[in-house]
Structure formats: C-alpha cells, structure tokens
C-alpha cells in the first residue's frame, strides 16, 4: 500500500485555523445548496474534538484484545461493536458469512541443540502453517542465507528433511514489509520444492518481537512454518556458520477445521432522499492475536464508530445511506467483505462508493482510487472542506490486500485511505501492536478527513456507474492487478467465478 513518509506536526490551534481557513476558502465555492457547508463543518469540528473515540480504541485493544477470526475474542469483539453502535443510537446488525477454514495457534515452542549447546528461542506459527505431530517434529536446522535461488543451489540436497533457517533484514518501514511478502513467495516455493521439513524465518522486527505473516500459499500449504525471535535465530545462524551442526525440535499445536460461520458488524444511517444508494465505509474488526490490534485495525474501527456516533448526535441526514462495515476474516483473505458483496449482490448497482481504511494510525495523505480516474475529482471535491489537514494526493492504481477488493472486482467505485507509515511497519501483526502505537491527534484528524469524504459522497449529485465484468477485466489487462491477485492467492477464485462480478449473460436471438 506504500504510504509516503511526509512529516506532519501541528498544535490544536493550528488544526482549527487550518480547518476554518479551508472552509472559508475553497470549500465555500464547492458547497452545494441546502446547508452542506455548515453540515460538514459541524461534523468535522465534532470529530476533531474530545469524543469517545480514543477510549473506544483503548477498550477494544485492552479489554477485547487480539481478535483472530474464529476465536472467542473475535466473537466478543462483534458484541462489543454492536453495543457501541447501539449506545450511539445507530442501528446495527451482525451479518453472517462463510469462512472457508479455521486456523488458530494454540501453542508454539522450539528447542535448538547441538554439541555442547541447547537453547529454546521463542517462535510463532505462521497462519496456515501445518501443525507438527504430537510431541513435536525434530529435524536438522540448515542455514539457507536469504533463501534466494543461489542459496538453495549452494546447500543442494541437504534441504531435504531439514528445517531451513532464512535470514532477514531488520524491518524499519512499510517498504521493507512489502519486500518481505514478495520474497516469501519464492523462498517458500523453493523450500517445499526441495523437500524441506519446514521453514523458519529469522524475526525481522526490532526488540525480538514475534509476529504473524500468512504463508504465501495460504490454506494449500503443506509444511510447518514459523518465525523465530531475532536474537535466537541469529545465535543459531552463527553456530551453524561456525561449523556446529544443530537440530531443532518444533512443537506447533493448532486449532484447525473446515468452513464455519463468522460475522461482520454493519451499522447504518439511512439516506433521507436517496436511501437506495449506499456509501460503504469499511474497516476490518479482526486482527492477529499476538498483540492488541491497535494499528491493524482497531484504530480505524474506533474511528468509524465515532463517525457514526457524531452523525447521529448532530442529527445530520445524508442523502444516501451510509453503512459502517466492520469486517471480519480480513487477515485470512478478505472473506468478510467478500461475504457482504455476495449477500448484498442485488443492491450493488446502487452502491455509490466503498471505502477501506486499513493502514494503521498514520496521517491520511490521500486515497487510492483503484483504476477509476473519474473518482479522482470527486475525492478532491469531497476533501475541500478539510484541505487544511492535507495536502492530499490521490493515486489511481488498483491495490490488492484489503477490503476494497471484492467491491473492485464487482465493479463498485472503491477507495483505500493512503496513510503515512508512522509506526506501522515494525509493529505490523506483531506483539507490539498495542494502544500506545497510535497518536490521538492524528486519529482525530483522520476521522475528520474520512468524515468529510463520507459526507461528500453521501450528498454530492455525482455518482459513478457500476462497471461490468468486461471493464474489470480491462483494468486487469492494463495494470498489474492480475499479478497482485495471484500473489494473494485470489486469482483462482476470480477465474472460478466465486469472486467478482459474473460475466454478463449473452441472450441468443429468437429463431424466426
């Protein structure tokens, strides 16, 4: 998602001045009749103030905690979100959808030993890792460097039946995070192809943090795969490079199973004049379970709940219906938003826009418009009232990796909030993803930006039509969307027709 690194500091006074200046200037010219300028000022001003949003984030992170889909804490998060919406006077329901498979870690441990040495570094199973046999799995530990093709060629047949230890760079930013994902595809394919017993990644995070990355092949994976704390992995690597043979015994106990039912939480403020037209504001409720899930994605869940709360409190009535969608199953493949698209298929022609906010707590500096150039001026127009919180740059490339995906594949105009990296990269899916990673002022400013965007799309006269499958296919041919989908193991579902807008039926002429 490649957020930029523009620095941004301000005081509360400067924030207020910037907002007022923006509204008196450009926004005044763009305001439509009927008090829209006043309404957006009321909304953004409220969101910048002392609302319950930050306390909601603390409650979700500290009291509910990590929220892996299928877990008891995830079920509690659904009840938590419903209670927050209803307490704000916002109608809300939980909507069921089908998760294709259950995967939860129950416990993970490892012991490394060789002549005269034995130690037990901490490990975390990677999502979609297989479990080890009862009692654990012991195998030689083999140093394969960075896991490049040349590294596997160097060690040759030694890979077969061994745990391969993969060296990583220490991760400092989002660019490094996406490099990890890209490199893992080749590393894991080479390891499995050579007959490795399993894959052990040296932890890349500062401070010996453990974290979870999905195995690159997802549920098709056939090997135990894990992350080992950085210091322990470096020690093992030094011993191996000193010529000391090592064996590792890993014990990964998992809770796995077939398809099951999970739930999204959908709050709604019904449109006053065009209720059949819908603006979807989405943030995923689930998180991985090592940390509390503040950056990914509790902060943006709290933000959307507060946006709904302030709209209701102020009595603002949008022309279009606004749905506040707290998705589940995002971390395992965006299954909650896919389920919504399937269950609301008959309504999608009326969906004006679907937004995903999912890149942490850094400042929103624009939006991905995902291959829909006509969206750019509409986003620019909606953001005029909060121009003082910018600058904002819209990026018109399709992005895969969050809950805009199934809307994009179904032809609905869709956006992703682009955000500065801030503390996102090193704490992504990590034990350190806790409440302290988020800055309250930035979170409030982001809420104002999303509030202005939402109000703009819910009230403006313009609306982009839904695209057909042929137009989505044209986007795939013109961009790297196909490659992105393949890297996330999503392409087969598109080809099979289980995701995306179905092809238009060809009507045969009636014989005369």
Task: Put a short name on every predicted segment.
Residues 37-39, 123-156, 215-294, 306-309, ...:
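Soluble metallo-hydrolase cores and metallopeptidase-like ectodomains found primarily
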Residues 183-184, 188-191, 265, 281, ...:
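Alpha-helical metal-binding/catalytic segments enriched in His/Glu/Asp
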Residues 11-22:
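Bacterial N-terminal signal peptides
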Residues 36-71, 97, 209-215, 286-287, ...:
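N-terminal capping segment at the start of a domain
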Residues 29-36, 42, 58, 62-163, ...:
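Noncatalytic luminal/extracellular "stalk/propeptide" segments of secretory-pathway proteins
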Residues 40-48, 62-72, 139-144, 171-188, ...:
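Second-shell loop/turn segments in exported
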Residues 309, 313, 425-488, 497-499, ...:
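His/Asp/Glu-rich mid-to-C-terminal helical/loop segments that flank catalytic regions of hydrolases
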Residues 48, 274, 289, 327-427, ...:
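Metal-dependent peptidase/peptidase-like ectodomains
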